Swiss-Prot record:
Result of altering residue 169 to A: Loss of catalytic activity
Lineage, opening ranks: Eukaryota, Sar, Alveolata, Apicomplexa, Aconoidasida
NCBIfam families for the chain: TGR (TIGR01438)
Protein name: Thioredoxin reductase
Effect annotated for changing residue 164 to A/S: Loss of catalytic activity
Gene it is expressed from: TRXR
Keyword terms: Cytoplasm, Disulfide bond, FAD, Flavoprotein, Mitochondrion, NADP, Oxidoreductase, Redox-active center, Transit peptide
């Protein structure tokens, strides 16, 4: 990577001997400035601003005297590994001997300007696509957004808004709330003085309520696009070339139309995966795409998978009163803190959810109105519903990416994009769940989409920060996390450099009624009370004065508790800051102000008493 930059007519001038590292720092500092787009066949588009290069040199007069003679020749650039991705970037290229740019004053020959139908064409009407489209329009871009929902294996479709609003976050939390309501009545209400004769749940009424709210959100999103001056087309889109998109209006394959765009964003998200090697699975099973609009009540249900989607769905179905079994290959919630994952699973077992550990379906057969499932342990059982939640794959089928030689991870159909949302095609970007190695969370897609739009259309040099992203899992006992798990911290920093503070305790409201285990989970007639319901855990770096790098909470309202803690972690909070903070009593969250037992001490971290996270025993 020597001779990174050469100059016409004055390559020996000492003011222009820029070493490779310093130049790349300049490029990285000002990456994605709208005014200077470097066309590239590399793994990402390099954007930079001549202002910063000009001011790098002490003698500005000598620089400006030959400024018009500059001819940049960048070779073998950016081979350093991207911090977010597990692949490398190569070669920002030349065009006719010059780096191409929109308003390039650094060369004698300006790049030819093209006329496009739109400045920004967005494929995908989920959170990331809509947010990026509206942000771009707010900065004067002409924006077109395509959205089309391909039916699930069971024929389920929905409106604009993507997975989150239609078949993800929104309906999931509503059904979680309905299930939690049922659990409170069934398990605790009598002890608190409530009397009722017949507690019965109406599945159809729940689905009607959920779907009605979703439709109202679909309408508000359409209104939002219109008011933002984003043109919307309900069309199945695919790429023709790096600046051309063809589409079929409302999926009608008999008529193909095309539009051109200066930049194209792919934000098509993911869809649930059903295995091909399980006979009858694709024909007879449903996924999370179907459960929230299921017309008949699910009845006795088998959930296949150990993902957070699997546990959330099995959790609210169990809480609604259905017989639920979960078939898992190995561990649950892979990638999350495993102590917390085990606690979530234990709570679910104590509430009556059955787990088949290391046992998976091998064959599904229709038996009248039920499904006969044959398992890998040679057993079989009848179920009313089988729901697969074993993972998701990028929704890229039909986008024609292969003809453009776009880099894609073929194992999960996700587009390989860097931390700047750039693909290996200069004018094409990817945000949200469809992008490789990006957290599958709606707020992440929204933020990445907005930042990308500002870089393209507002001269911004913002870069998406993927550190300390909070998340919450809406299982019967919720789990919120931000930062590193205990296992990941050990892997990155070494066990000797990590301290883990933790406390296990009982939620106040549950302690008061001595909530009991489901009969399935009772070992004998004396094994009645549930285990401690809550866990508070801080993962800290010893050599940085116990700076907190991991926050984990298992307990009620985990999402609400975790959100504020995420801000603290981003501000580099230390354990002593928690110690010096006064908690709100009696709450579960105050436990984080009272942590003093470490895993390395070997002492018991089970708190005595029953007043939540406070000191009461």
């Amino acid at each position: 990577m020597n001779n990174v930059i050469s100059f016409i007519g004055n390559s020996s001038n000492k003011y222009f001997q820029i070493n490779q590292l310093h130049f790349i720092r300049i490029i990285n500092k000002n990456i994605h400035s709208k005014n200077n787009l470097i066309n590239s066949n590399s793994s990402y588009n390099v954007f930079y601003n001549k202002y910063f290069i000009k001011n790098t040199f002490q003698n500005k007069n000598k620089l400006s005297s030959i400024y018009s003679k500059l001819n940049f020749s960048i070779k073998n650039m950016c081979k350093d590994k991207n911090e977010k991705k597990n692949y490398e970037h190569v070669n920002a290229n030349e065009k006719n001997g010059y780096l191409a740019s929109e308003k390039n004053e650094l060369t004698k020959n300006k790049v030819e300007e093209h006329t496009y139908d739109y400045d920004y064409v967005v494929i995908g009407g989920g959170p990331g696509g809509m947010a990026s489209a509206k942000e771009a329009a707010a900065h004067g871009a002409r924006v077109l957004l395509f959205d089309y929902v391909k039916p699930s294996s069971q024929g389920t479709k929905w409106g604009i808004g993507g997975t989150c609003v239609n078949v993800g976050c929104v309906p999931k939390k509503l059904m979680h709330y309905a299930g939690h309501m049922g659990s409170i009545f069934k398990l605790d209400s009598k002890a608190y003085g409530w009397k009722f004769d017949n507690l019965k749940h109406d599945w159809k009424k729940l689905v009607t309520t959920v779907q009605s709210h979703i439709r109202s959100l679909n309408f508000s999103y359409m209104t939002g696009l219109r008011s933002s001056k984003v043109k919307y087309i309900n069309g199945l889109a695919k790429l023709k070339d790096k600046n051309t998109v063809s589409y079929y209006l409302k999926g009608d394959l008999s008529k193909e139309e095309t539009v051109t765009g200066k930049y194209i964003l792919i934000a098509t998200g993911c869809r649930p995966h059903i295995p091909d090697d399980v006979e009858g699975a694709k024909e007879l099973s449903i996924t999370s795409d179907d459960i929230f609009s299921l017309k008949k009540d699910p009845g006795k249900t088998l959930v296949v998978g150990a993902s957070y989607v699997a546990l959330e769905c099995s959790g609210f179905l169990n809480s609604l009163g259905y017989d639920v079994t979960v078939a898992v290959r190995s561990i649950v919630l892979r990638g999350f803190d495993q102590q917390c994952a085990v606690k979530v699973k234990l709570y679910m077992e104590e509430q009556g959810v059955m787990f088949k550990n290391g046992i998976l379906p091998k064959k599904l057969t229709k038996m009248d109105d039920k499904i006969l499932v044959e398992f890998s342990d040679k057993t079989s059982e009848l179920y009313d519903t089988v729901l697969y939640a074993i993972g998701r794959k990028g929704d890229i089928d039909g986008l024609n990416l292969e003809s453009l030689n776009m880099n894609v991870n073929k194992s999960n159909n996700k587009i390989i994009a860097d931390h700047l949302s750039c693909t290996n095609i200069p004018s094409i970007f990817a945000v949200g769940d469809v992008a490789e190695n990006v957290p599958e969370l709606a707020p992440v897609a929204i933020k990445a989409g907005e930042i990308l739009a500002r870089r393209l259309f507002k001269d911004s040099d913002e870069i998406m920060d993927y550190s300390y992203i909070p998340t919450s899992i809406y299982t019967p006992i919720e789990y919120g996390a931000c930062g590193y798990s205990e296992e990941k911290a050990y892997e990155l920093y070494g066990k000797s450099n990590v301290e883990v503070f933790l406390q296990e305790f009982n939620n106040l409201e549950i302690s008061a009624v001595h909530r009991q285990k489901h009969i399935r989970a009772q070992k004998d007639e004396y094994d009645l009370d549930v285990s401690s319901t809550c866990l508070a855990k801080l993962v800290c770096l010893k050599n940085e004065d116990n700076r907190v790098i991991g926050f984990h909470y298992v307990g009620p309202n985990a999402g609400e508790v975790t959100q504020g803690m995420a801000l603290a972690l981003r501000l580099k909070v230390k354990k002593k800051d928690f110690d010096n903070c006064i908690g709100i009593h009696p709450t579960d969250a105050e436990s984080f102000m009272n942590l003093f037992v470490t895993i390395s001490s070997g002492l018991s971290y089970a708190a005595k008493g029953g007043c939540g996270g406070g000191k009461c025993g």
